[in-house]
Amino acid sequence: MERYDKERLVETVLYVLNKTGELDYYTLLKTIYFAELKHLAKWGQRITADDVCAMPYGPVLSHLLDAIKGDSHEPELSRMLKSAFKFASEDASNIMLPLRKANEDYLSESEKEALDASIQENASLSFEQLKNKSHDKIWLKNYREGKGKKGTGCRTIKQIHSRYKYTKSDCRNTTSRNIPHIPAR
């Protein structure tokens, strides 16, 4: 990921955490994921440039998940996130708290609208509700294909687009920054 994309990802995380006050990282990941789908469906562009991968509990932004868990191949992203949030305590090691306000200059109004809508729809859902909501046919196909194989199971943008019936001509104004090719890691 380019530095700008990492900064946007961190500011997106902070935006959601500032709006909610605190969130467990599973709910945070799903809230951002569903905002990505909303923004893609309406505008033909994603909010972040992170890879979306099929994991056992549904699709996730993979670089963000790895960085949150301290398992990142992106040390710069990990450092940036450490200065942006903290975990609540040892007893609540999955609850994230913001350490500063988000720099909203990194987000467009349409991106903030998609994030706000996703926060309203998803931030109060249980783990099970979020898991069920995110387990669709595309996730299942990618997860089955990649199960047990390191580096497989990532969704492609084409598959995400097809879910929302976008064609190449619908997305002609997109850029690689907004909608990257999502390679298998």
For each predicted feature, which ranges?
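Domain-edge interaction signal
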Residues: 1-185
